[in-house]
Amino acid sequence: MSDLTKKKLQIGLIVDSDSIDRWQFDAVANCSDIVEINTIIYCQNSQSKKNLLKHVLYYLLNLLSIRNRQTTQVAWSKLTSTSSQIVKFNCQQTGNWQTIDVTTQEKLAEKNLDLFVKFGMNLLRDPNLLRAKYGVLSFHHGDPMKFRGRPAGFYELKQHADEIGAVVQELSNHLDAGQMRAFGKYQICAHSYRRTLEALYANSASLLRQAILNCLDEQTLNIVPTGKNYRLPTNFSVVHFSLLMIIRKVKRLFFGLFQHRQWQIAQAEHLNFAIEKAKTEILLLKTLPIPRGVGFIADPFVLPNGEVICEATTKNSQRGFLMTIDNAENSRIKTSILGKNHLSFPFVVKHADRLLVMPEMAANGSQVICELNQSFEITKVHSLQGLENERLIDPVLLFRDLKWWLFADKSGNEADHLFLWSSENIYGPYVAHRMNPIVVDPSRARNAGAFFNINNEIFRLGQDNRHDYGDGITVCRVTQLNDLAYDEAPVTRLMIAGHKGPHTVSTNGSKTYVDYYDKKFSPIAWLARVKAQF
């Protein structure tokens, strides 16, 4: 791998106006420590042909949904320095393909750039003639194995796809046939095209950095573009799409007003992931009774003595607190020292003969880890150095190769982004992994419990949040974990017949607990959601 501290890569930015989209601006800004914009390649005559009669309703949909906060225009000049140069040219156009003239190509060749990033123009003919060490990188929003072409997100929503993909590839003369440098999967907001696209554009911006790092590491992804090449939708297709969105919005409104998730915890059979299979059905042995006065219990973690520490709520509330449960009694843990807001996901770990709990507490502030006494009372609170400015979701620790590895999501994109930090001391200082986010996939990004060690293999559990929240767990075998890289491979999907879930799994070796939920009708379900806002 190249030493990123030596010299920044010199890049050329291909544009066709004085501004670029907000998400494009953020993508480049996120790489400011490893790249420098040497040259702006400015096409002055780029045009797209439009068939207004055939696609008039699509262009109306564009105004209402596709244009959003992430497509707001930002001047690219804010990314340049005083030494940046601008090369203006007029492209040659044949159909949807555009070509950069030979004179401009020769000017750019003299600059010996490391790579080009394309944010403007249509399809670029002969990108290989723009001589750069790592070629021309370009975004495509859509999974090339399923949905090629355009518009981004439309057909995924229309066909109720599991997720929407995005890729950064090195361009060639054939559609989606260049080397794939970075790829991610993102959650679909089934009832809103605008929200789907805003999240897609905002979250996919991180792919540019990963693509550049993979260029430096000479890494490519084995992705074959076998998906259907879609075109702009007809007016009839837009009408059908709009009706689907209306129906889904009505269903979502009904759920918000009159339905809630009734979470429960159950003891389950022992799990073994040694044999790979598409789905593993969990057998529930005994469901724990919900304590009196409690609305639901979820997020179970098994304590050394076999008791369960979990999240609980009062009735008609969504604000979680921590509770221990055993067959004899239940006890609410005093957590006022951590704040008055939501607490959940109480990950537990033993360290230096001390029992520690690290709950999800993003609503209260930066992450801490707490010492528990034999009565499971908090006796001491430790801040995690290096994470003071982060708001972590469902954090989990793993000790491996003389290091503590902290896996967590961040508030805002917790459904499909997993981040990693490491430290030689459990209390920090923690350093962010160079390939963050290390997982971009709504089927497994968000943690679903502690790591499993089976036959000296490490397995990570990730929530499946593609459609319903916490509806199943994807088990992943960790295949690579070091300061330079992280990789994992899905092994199986855990499910519970007749219920939604599991959402969290925990074991102490002898006992295994899971949580699950059913959707229940309640005429005052809306009340808990209103109270959660205050």
Predicted regions and their residues:
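Conserved blade-ending motifs and adjacent loop-strand segments that build the rim/top face
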Residues: 434-450, 485-505
